[in-house]
Amino acid sequence: MISRYTREEMGRVWSEEGKFRRWLEVEIAATETLAERGVVPAAAAAKIRENARVDAGVVRRIAELESKVKHDVIAFTMAVGETIGDPGAARWLHYGMTSNDVVDTAQALQLREASRLIEHDIVRFGEVLERRAREFQHTPQIGRTHGVHAEPITFGLKIANWFAENRRNLERFGHAARQMAVGKISGAVGNASHLGPEVEAAICKRLGLEVAPVASQVIQRDRHAEYLSTLAILTATLEKIALEIRHLQRTEVREAEEPFGGEQRGSSAMPHKRNPVSSEQVCGLARVVRANAGAAYENIALWHERDISHSSVERIILPDSTILADYLLARMTEIVAGMRVFPERMRRNLDSTGGLIYSGQLLQDLVEAGAAREDAYKWVQEHAMAAWETETNFQQRVAADPRITKILDRVALEHTFDLERQLRHVDAIFARVFS
């Protein structure tokens, strides 16, 4: 992923040096586990622990060797072996293991670290959502369906929806992250013929990982597909929120807008512009994460016990998707935390249709008072369509219709068009969401 969208801590997880450090962590765990069982000499394991290293120079050496041997794990073991300084000890590095014992298990360590960062981001975003939902718990806003005014809500209720979805994302992601926290040291085809299941489990335990109950040469890629699917859902939620902010920032609506800095400029040609560029960026980058999930599905089907077709794909989609999820969560947290809200504009828009938004309540009240539903629907729609076409006040038209007023008197009609009546259950919904 380009540096523009990479936050520092997540970037370190996926750096070349970070990756090779995790590879070395797996190699050391294996040699120490084998030393405890008398397979590897204790002195050799100690020498490997003490001297083997990965730094910028070693990373360059790995690249140099890989250009010759055309195999990254072999280049790694050669370069790290040189740092040990004792050929007798270095020969035990990578003992009994195949490349993907190291690569897949180390990848699990990287994903565990990346997942911790993302989980922290999700929690922090949820805290901001809850704060802003409570801030606007009783701020009336028109609810829209198909982009058209429907019935009243509160802006806090809209944000509460975002909060609840974010909480589901946290639960989903936690499950997917646990599915990825597994290692395998079962050899070239998964039969554990060189080291055995007990040693495999012990190495994984030393690394703080579960052991994959069964594997081929690789951990099965349904786990990866689930993980990336969860990231796709997570970032789709962020896109959904960003898209809503973009709609609310339209000039004709202007009920909310993303933060706009004091020295920020919206256009090189039009000085008046305050464009929702951050929200647009979120919408764009979420598409990349979704596309990457599709690539992960393609990696599930491999030839027999493994081919390498998934490897090149994962070198892109795993870093890019976790880096983008981290970036987008931080971005949306900033946007929602600094979002400007215009309650007066919300109320003006809500009132702009002259009571049309209460047509559903009027229909219900007429039926409850004894009118036939088809008759009531016809009367209400007749006035609603006329109010749309002539831009007249719906409430006044209804109050002048004897077919309606003989069923609902003035007091009853005032109750029909009462905004507070529409919003009377908001507190109960909040108690349910934030319990």
Which residues does each PLM region occupy?
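A helix-coil-helix interface module used to build multimeric assemblies
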Residues: 1-192, 196-202, 211, 266-267, ...
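Glycine-rich cofactor/substrate-binding loops
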Residues: 1-22, 46, 65-69, 270-435
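Amphipathic alpha-helices that form helix-helix packing interfaces
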Residues: 30-33, 118, 122-125, 129-132, ...
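Alpha-helical support elements that line or immediately flank enzyme active sites
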Residues: 31-32, 110-122, 231-240, 245, ...
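Conserved hydrophobic residue
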Residues: 40, 253-254, 372
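A structural signal for small-residue-enriched, beta-sheet-centric alpha/beta enzyme cores
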Residues: 99, 191-192, 204-206, 211-218, ...
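Short, well-ordered beta-strand elements within core beta-sheets of diverse protein domains
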Residues: 157, 225-233, 361-369
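Acidic, glycine-rich loop-and-beta core segments that form the ion-binding/anion-interacting portion
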Residues: 200-293
